[in-house]
């Protein structure tokens, strides 16, 4: 969940790039003028495809990002309206060595995306179809679809499907990094619902991947999918609706931090219960605060209250408990801050950490460091730390070998969000240093052998092993070499083409 100025919220987007060494250097295109190249390509594009250059009316609207911390930059943006047009654009970019990002929700924030400079934006916002197949109990979507588009269509058909937490994130982009969310314990990761994809490769070929078609590619897509191509269609298995979600929004005094963190760290979570703990600064009370946003799926409010007793008996000073339809879960949980969180052009300097061990002392130390930081750096008081403690019963029920995603045993995903008002604020240096320090603290007591990170929460400075897992990298590198040997799709937490 990414937090806004007072609080909140999650994920990665479908992205690609062209770079011989994307992990180390920003790539700027050199050679023929991009306007000329695009002009030469335009005759093969459909007449509904739109081309935008900086200064034109729609250029900003099709390139504006959620996070403006170390962003990519573009010489042009193109909004294709057919799959064939996307193929033509990929071939054009590869032929002329043009770096590009193919964007859906434009919600990705890893700093590796910022290595794409003066490139091409392939805006996939036209591809917004959400189609239900009740007979097969599936939903098929395009790359322009965000979670907010999926909720009402799936819910009104009588189903639910795994999603992320924030409504404005691109569903396919979040999926291909694994996709974590509030139904993890019941149904598993979002990739566990994925049945098939249709993808354009670096050569401009269209391939399909599933457990029966190109199964090795399908394995890699489920956890590292941004590295292999542009997904133009994805189909997911739906689940019969479990009814309303029970939501708990609780706020605690800062003095309760030791008791609260020990309670959360030692609390049993049944499959339907999630606990999100948010350390933030309250601008109204002018003091640190701790927010807990919990949800319970698959049971009654009375049942949910029984499971939540360890937290309720701590007597939070604010308490809002209610049943909400699943389709409004993103918008009405976590104090209803989804709209504020989803505002574009904000600064989010994000660091992520996986935990499989809950060390309450580390959480207490983090809160105390933040309290001191907020007091000394008022320009960064919108910074926060979010701990998403999701039950993982259904996640670990899927064999580790089934997908490329390596961290199924994680029990909490930490998102450290360092924030300030606008790019260029001098507080950036000290805020970024604090983010790194907190990440290191969590990693030391995480229960893993060093830092590991859910790739959708990666900052961009992590090693491939820390994102993709040492035991998965040899197989992933072989796939990368097979489908994208020149790293055309190399700006979103890129894979190597050989390992070790």
UniProtKB/Swiss-Prot annotation:
Provide the residues annotated with a glycan attachment (glycosylation).
47, 257, 282
Q: Which residues form a coiled coil?
A: none
**Keywords, A to Z?**
FAD, Flavoprotein, Glycoprotein, Oxidoreductase, Signal
Q: What PANTHER family does the entry give?
A: BINDING OXIDOREDUCTASE, PUTATIVE (AFU_ORTHOLOGUE AFUA_1G17690)-RELATED, FAD-LINKED OXIDOREDUCTASE AFOF
> Per its record, what are the GO molecular function terms?
FAD binding; oxidoreductase activity
Organism from which the protein derives: Neurospora crassa (strain ATCC 24698 / 74-OR23-1A / CBS 708.71 / DSM 1257 / FGSC 987)
**Protein family per UniProt:** Belongs to the oxygen-dependent FAD-linked oxidoreductase family.
Which residues belong to the signal peptide in this entry? 1-20
In the Enzyme Commission scheme, what number(s) does this protein have?
1.1.1.-
Q: Does the keyword DNA damage apply?
A: no
Induction conditions: Expression is up-regulated during sexual development. Expression is also up-regulated during confrontation with the arthropod fungivore Drosophila melanogaster.
EC top class named in words? oxidoreductase
What cofactor(s) does the depicted protein rely on?
FAD
* Role according to the record: FAD-linked oxidoreductase; part of the gene cluster that mediates the biosynthesis of sordarial, a salicylic aldehyde structurally related to the phytotoxin pyriculol. The most interesting aspect of this pathway is formation of an aromatic product from the highly reducing polyketide synthase srdA. SrdA synthesizes a reduced polyketide chain from one molecule of acetyl-CoA and five molecules of malonyl-CoA. The polyketide chain is then reductively released as an aldehyde.
State what protein this is by name.
FAD-linked oxidoreductase srdI
Annotated membrane-spanning segments are none
SUPFAM superfamilies (UniProt xref): FAD-binding/transporter-associated domain-like (SSF56176)
Q: From which lineage does this chain's organism come?
A: Eukaryota, Fungi, Dikarya, Ascomycota, Pezizomycotina
């Amino acid at each position: 969940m990414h937090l806004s100025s007072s609080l909140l919220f999650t994920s990665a987007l479908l992205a690609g790039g062209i770079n011989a060494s994307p992990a180390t250097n920003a790539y700027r295109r050199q050679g023929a003028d991009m306007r000329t190249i695009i002009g030469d390509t335009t005759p093969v594009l459909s007449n509904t495809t739109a081309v935008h250059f900086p200064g034109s009316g729609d250029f900003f609207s099709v390139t504006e990002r959620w996070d403006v911390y170390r962003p990519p930059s573009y010489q042009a943006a193109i909004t294709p309206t057919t799959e064939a047009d996307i193929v033509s654009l990929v071939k054009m970019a590869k032929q002329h060595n043009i770096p590009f990002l193919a964007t859906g929700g434009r919600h990705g924030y890893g700093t590796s995306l910022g290595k794409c400079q003066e490139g091409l934006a392939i805006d996939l916002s036209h591809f917004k179809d959400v189609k239900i197949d009740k007979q097969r109990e599936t939903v098929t979507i395009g790359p322009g679809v965000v979670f907010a588009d999926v909720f009402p269509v799936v819910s009104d058909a009588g189903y639910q499907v795994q999603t992320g937490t924030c409504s404005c994130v691109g569903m396919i982009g979040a999926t291909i990094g694994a996709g974590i969310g509030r139904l993890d314990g019941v149904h598993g990761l979002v990739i566990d619902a994925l049945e098939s994809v249709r993808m354009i490769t670096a050569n401009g070929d269209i391939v399909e991947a599933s457990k029966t078609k190109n199964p090795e590619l399908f394995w890699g897509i489920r956890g590292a999918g941004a590295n292999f191509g542009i997904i133009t269609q994805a189909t997911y298995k739906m689940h019969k609706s479990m009814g309303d979600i029970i939501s708990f929004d609780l706020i605690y005094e800062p003095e309760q931090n030791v008791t609260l963190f020990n309670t959360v760290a030692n609390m049993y979570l049944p499959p339907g219960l999630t606990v999100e703990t948010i350390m933030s600064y309250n601008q109204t009370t002018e003091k640190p605060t701790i927010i807990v946003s919990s949800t319970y799926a698959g049971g009654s409010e009375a049942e949910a209250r029984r499971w939540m007793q360890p937290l309720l008996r701590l007597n939070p000073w604010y308490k809002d408990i209610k049943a909400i339809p699943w389709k409004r879960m993103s918008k009405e949980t976590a104090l209803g801050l989804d709209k504020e969180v989803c505002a574009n052009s904000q600064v989010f300097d994000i660091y992520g950490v996986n935990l499989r061990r809950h060390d309450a002392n580390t959480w207490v130390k983090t809160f105390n460091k933040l309290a001191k930081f907020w007091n000394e750096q008022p320009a960064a008081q919108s910074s926060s730390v979010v701990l998403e403690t999701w039950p993982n019963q259904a996640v670990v029920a899927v064999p580790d070998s089934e997908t490329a995603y390596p961290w199924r045993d994680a029990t909490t995903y930490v998102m450290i969000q360092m924030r300030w008002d606008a790019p260029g604020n001098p507080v950036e240096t000290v805020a970024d240093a604090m983010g790194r320090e907190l990440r290191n603290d969590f990693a030391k007591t995480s229960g893993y052998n060093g830092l590991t990170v859910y790739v959708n929460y990666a900052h961009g400075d992590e090693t491939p092993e820390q994102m993709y897992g040492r035991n998965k990298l040899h197989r992933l590198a072989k796939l990368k070499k097979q489908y994208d040997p020149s790293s055309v799709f190399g700006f979103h937490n890129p894979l190597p083409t050989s390992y070790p």
